[in-house]
Structures are given as structure tokens and as C-alpha cells.
Amino acid sequence: MKKSFLILVSFIFSVSLMAQEKTTPVSDVNALKSEMQQSASKIKTISSDFTQEKFMSVMASKMVSKGKFYYQKEDKVTLQYLTPFKQNLVMNGTKLMMEANGKKNVLDATSNPMMAELKKVISACMGGNIASMGSDYKLEFFQTGGLYLIKIYPQSVNIKKVAEMVDLYLDKKDFSVVKMKMLEPLKKGQKTNDYTEYIFENKKFNSPIDASVFSIK
């Protein structure tokens, strides 16, 4: 179960560390949250291409994967990895399925509070309903160029075990997720600088998605 959970974290989270770009604080956070919620209320489905880049300090180079991303309100998320290997991550209601090499592993979020929180984070981020994350997360809002940057700091001890921070980059035009990143948790009190980054491209909104995409069997 622990191994499966760590695999889940690697699948779900990602980020873009744009440290070289200047960011400025958002002056009216409440207005931004309101705009985000209005935009999110209009979104029923999202489909896009994605690129995942995983950096680990013990590796000589980044591990790059590509695939298809699907989201359906309220709580259905699928990542279909196409290269270099075919594998799937499906979140549907309280269930989560990881499929690779012809083998499936189905987990129940209701039996694992940590997994339930991670599911809430990914659904809130993808659906644009950041306000639903509640007091277990500290949020900071910035802007840079044509993007908003939301820094998400988990306050829950459980979540801190798997993520030190999440950076979420939103397109100012439609508040859709452009990039998303997770910084790995501290190890022995020290930062690892390890992270996973997702880049979302060719997004389509409110297009029909076949129910089989979110099927868990």
C-alpha cells in the first residue's frame, strides 16, 4: 500500500519552478477567487495533451513522459500515459486505479485520509475551485506575464509527508491550468530539490468524453 501511494503521488503532482521570472503579489485576491469560481462553474469537462518531467537529484537527467489528460466535474480525473510506456491513472469518486504492464491496482480513498486529501487537491486544482481546499492549505497568489501563480502550502501533517509545496500556474485568459508542480517533502529536515512538473497543452473545454475513460473495474 505504501509503495502504491508513493506511485500515486508521483502520478498526480507536478510543478513548474519559474524562479527566474519576476512575480508580483495579486492585489485583490478575493476578486481573483471570485473570477476563478465563475470560470470553474462553466467548465464541465477538460481534455488536453500533457508532458510530465520528473527530476530527481540522484538521476543524471529528467524522466519525461507524454500522454492525454481528462477531467470531468466533479471528481473524475484520468491521466493516460502514452510514451515512453503506456499506463493509466484514473480517479473516479472514492476510487483510484493505477494500471501498468497489464496489471491494475485499485485503491479506496475513504480508507486512507491522506489519499482523500490528495484527491481533493487534484480535483480542486484541475477544476479551478481552489476555495474548496479549506483551511488545511495556505494559499499565496502572484502573477507573472500572462499567468497567475498560486503557491499551495499543505498545513496537514499527513500531506506534508508527501508534498512540501505545490505551484499552480493558470492562464489569465481562461484560468485553466498551464503548469503544475510538486516539490518533494523534506528528507531528514533538508530540501531535496526533487520535483515533478506537468505541462498542459491543446486544451479543449466542455467536449464530450466517453464514460469508459473514467471506468474503474
Enumerate the predicted regions with their spans.
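Flexible, membrane-facing loop/turn or short amphipathic-helix motifs
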Residues: 55-62, 187-191
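A short, Trp-centered hydrophobic/proline-enriched beta-strand micro-motif
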Residues: 39-57, 78
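Extended beta-sheet lipid-handling architectures
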Residues: 48-50, 64-66, 91, 152, ...
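Gly/Pro-enriched, hydrophobic low-complexity segments
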Residues: 130-217
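An acidic-aromatic
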Residues: 21-22, 68-120, 196
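Sec-dependent N-terminal signal peptides
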Residues: 4-14
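Positively charged n-region of N-terminal signal peptides that target proteins for export
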Residues: 1-4, 19-20
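Flexible, processing/modification-adjacent segments and terminal tails
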Residues: 21-25, 37, 41-42, 54, ...
